[in-house]
Amino acid sequence: MRILVFLFSMISLNGICQFSNYWIEKNDFTGGKRERSVAFSIENLGYICSGVNTSEVSLNDLWVYNPNTDSWEQKANLPGSVRRNAIGFSINGIGYVGMGMDSVIASESIPLNDFWAYNPLDNSWEQKANYPGNGGTGIYFSTAFTADGKGYVCGGKFGANSYSNELWEYKPSIDQWSQRTNFPGGVRYQLSSFTIDNKGYVGLGVNQDVYKKDFYVYNPGSNQWSQIQDFPTERGSASSFSIFNRGYICLGTNGGLLGDLIEYNPEINQWTAKCSYSGSERKCAVSFVINNRAYVGTGKGYSGKKDSMHEYFPENTLGVQDISNLSQTLIYPNPTSDIVNVRSYNNDAIQLIDSRGNIIQSIFNPEKLEKIDLSMLPKGIYFIKSIDFEEKIILE
């Protein structure tokens, strides 16, 4: 069955998709298929660094993504060792990457404690104070978040059977680490985290060999943790991000691979299923946010490592004026297998767009009721955009 999805409402066979809650496939990551990388965003650009490629070789390369051109460009390699399962974040226009393991084979690997700052203005790296946690032995499989101009690293592993529940705070202004209150969920690795209102939300992961679903919020001001509503299911190695004061957990593993997206609302302490990831199920993928849109990709799926990237449009991305115009365009039936009806009022053009953003068909000065034939198109998800000639995009 072909599925037509119009831009401001979406129906998918793979998940729950509602108003302004959908995914679009982007160009593949040109750094090659990989997993266990780190990512961060600076200004209007996204960055992916390190990881493990299809030859099972750890990496130290850095790539930058421009959403305006949907393209990638390689930048200066991370100095020091190649690494996997490191941490990354950005603060005040500077990217930070560190820790991890220097080899794919655990028995031949050394946990790393070095920490580096990337300046995009001159494409340069500078070494910063080493991570001092767990006696300075290094850490990998931990999670990181930022709050109030500081970075935080929580949990992880520092040996084959050595796990951490420590929380460390990094202050860029003085290049200094300080230990804070331990994570209350016990020792943990493969955790997930995101930031809302200058508070860190941390949970999930693996307690030695048991997948967990508990979640906690950390208040840097009081240096205290509080437990919040459990995540719906246990998992580790998920991707996470926050947009519009909402937190998101995507993908991961609970033994099998997962492809769902779950949103957390701190106002009501509740998790809600959102539109499932439009790519294949995977774990150890990366995520970053640009202009209130999330980009999630790479990772490892059932068929191996991935280079595909997908963009998520959350709810609340439309303004009041945009929302007031929704009633002027109706699309039905949806799903459809051949013909879709587009009833449009006061619009100068409508466009049919595929999931990669390619314009399939444009209709200028449309009739109030246009019938669009989809019978020759491959099955999938499509979008309708309504436009007027004053350059005002009614839906985006």
Q: How should each PLM-predicted stretch be described?
A:
Residues M1-L4, E396:
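Positively charged n-region of N-terminal signal peptides that target proteins for export
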Residues I3-L13:
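Sec-dependent N-terminal signal peptides
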Residues V5-L7, I139, N334, E370:
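Generic hydrophobic-segment detector
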Residues S9, C17-T317:
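Kelch-like beta-propeller repeat domains
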Residues N14, I105, K368-L369:
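Generic secondary-structure boundary signal with a strong preference for alpha-helix termini
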Residues I323-E396:
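C-terminal outer-membrane/trafficking sorting elements
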